[in-house]
């Protein structure tokens, strides 16, 4: 079986990407590193996101304007939908994610990249950074009602993030394999991804 240099795993918040990535890492004997979007975010000082990783972000200020702010985009009376607005400090960080993953791969470390493609620029960054590498792209989907139920149950996410990302993250790149965590168990999702690797020419 020809294992890829990078598993590029993309999906909305609360879709089960991290569970899938850790499951893949456990199931594959090769020494894959799991690197996540959130891992990079948490490298920054908390003042730049002030609880944007929690159920309620704190007040916006000059620092969050440079970092990340969770903006409600839905109209009054509609289900809450929230999107992230990245300032210049976080935009530099976001633009550095894929090149950092490339550096790990070039150092001999295959990577399972747990990503959230908020916009087209993030996809283009991956496309450029991973040029010449063997990449298997994995889309992680889930019905919106299940995403939102998970989001509420977790209690560590801004409510509305799942809805805000669900219709966005899958619009930027094609996938080699897609798994629906609303209908498949974590083990079945891992098996589907490994089967996609095995089926490649």
Regions found by a protein language model. Give the residues of each.
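Small-molecule kinase domains that catalyze NTP-dependent phosphoryl transfer to phosphate-bearing small molecules
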Residues: 144, 149-192, 199-201
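ATP-binding Walker
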Residues: 15
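ATP-dependent NMP and nucleoside kinases share a basic, alpha-helical "lid"
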Residues: 101-111, 116-155
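P-loop (Walker A) phosphate-binding loop of NTP-binding proteins
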Residues: 12
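Conserved substrate/cofactor phosphate-moiety recognition/catalytic segment
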Residues: 25-92
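Hydrophobic anchor at the beta1->P-loop junction of P-loop NTPases
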Residues: 9
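Walker A/P-loop
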Residues: 18
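Pre-Walker A (Motif I) flank of P-loop NTPase domains
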Residues: 2-6, 108-109
């Amino acid at each position: 079986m020809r294992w890829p240099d990078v598993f590029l795993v993309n999906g909305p918040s609360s879709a089960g990407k991290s569970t899938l990535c850790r499951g893949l890492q456990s199931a594959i004997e090769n020494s894959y590193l799991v690197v996540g979007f959130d891992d990079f975010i948490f490298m920054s000082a908390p003042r730049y996101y002030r609880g944007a990783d929690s159920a309620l972000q704190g007040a916006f200020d000059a620092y969050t304007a440079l970092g990340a702010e969770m903006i409600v985009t839905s109209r009054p009376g509609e289900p809450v939908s929230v999107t992230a607005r990245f300032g210049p400090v976080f935009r530099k960080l976001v633009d550095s994610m894929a090149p950092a993953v490339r550096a790990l791969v070039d150092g001999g470390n295959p990577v399972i990249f747990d990503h959230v493609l908020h916009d087209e620029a993030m996809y283009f960054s991956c496309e450029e950074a991973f040029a010449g590498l063997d990449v298997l792209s994995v889309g992680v989907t889930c019905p919106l009602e299940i995403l939102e139920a998970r989001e509420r149950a977790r209690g560590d996410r801004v409510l509305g993030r799942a809805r805000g990302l669900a219709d966005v993250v899958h619009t930027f790149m094609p996938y080699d394999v897609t798994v629906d965590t609303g209908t498949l168990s974590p083990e079945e999702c891992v098996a589907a991804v490994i089967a996609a690797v095995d089926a490649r020419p």
